[in-house]
């Protein structure tokens, strides 16, 4: 099995249990945050409440960002958003955050010696741990494909770029 197939397989397994890009647990967290800040029970939240709800979910939105988000999603122009609109917006936000975070976590797993780079040695170790019988030549090809600046190692940006290119994240 190739490295790409291994990553595809792992990614597929990870996606199981997700509905609409979010796990049921994440959807429940979003519902709880929305309900908590819909203090009047109207089924909608305004810009101020949106900011607080997003903070409760671990985001730090700026005032301008909040205004733009409401304008983008509040097609009726009411100045408020309902739960479905909030869920749609947070699904997108969490998806953006999750993919970057997942890729960085994966990078750190490869970079076990904390050099800030993935070397051929790191790649060999991971392949061995995964039970992949890859030759040095195959591992070198993988390194070469990701190594855009030609320094023989893969930095975080190069890793992020190659992972996004594979359409797995």
From Swiss-Prot:
Q: What are the entry keywords?
A: Calcium, Cell cycle, Cell division, Metal-binding, Mitosis, Repeat
- What is the documented function of this protein? This calcium-binding protein is found in the basal body complexes (the functional homolog of the centrosome in animal cell). In mitotic cells it is specifically associated with the poles of the mitotic spindles at the sites of the duplicated basal body complexes.
Q: Name one GO molecular function term.
A: calcium ion binding
UniProt-annotated binding residues for Ca(2+) 1: 38, 40, 42, 44, 49
Q: Where does Ca(2+) 2 bind?
A: 147, 149, 151, 153, 158
InterPro entries attached here?
CALM/Myosin/TropC-like (IPR050230), EF-hand-dom_pair (IPR011992), EF_Hand_1_Ca_BS (IPR018247), EF_hand_dom (IPR002048)
GO terms for biological process, alphabetical: cell division
Instruction: Specify the protein name.
Output: Caltractin
Q: Where is this region: Disordered?
A: 1-24
Q: Which Pfam families match?
A: EF-hand_7
The family this protein is said to belong to: Belongs to the centrin family.
- Domain EF-hand stretches: 25-60, 61-96, 98-133, 134-169
Question: Can you list the GO cellular component terms from the UniProt entry?
Answer: myosin II complex
The record's listing under SMART domains reads: EFh
* Originating species: Dunaliella salina
Q: From the record, give the cysteines joined by S-S bonds.
A: none
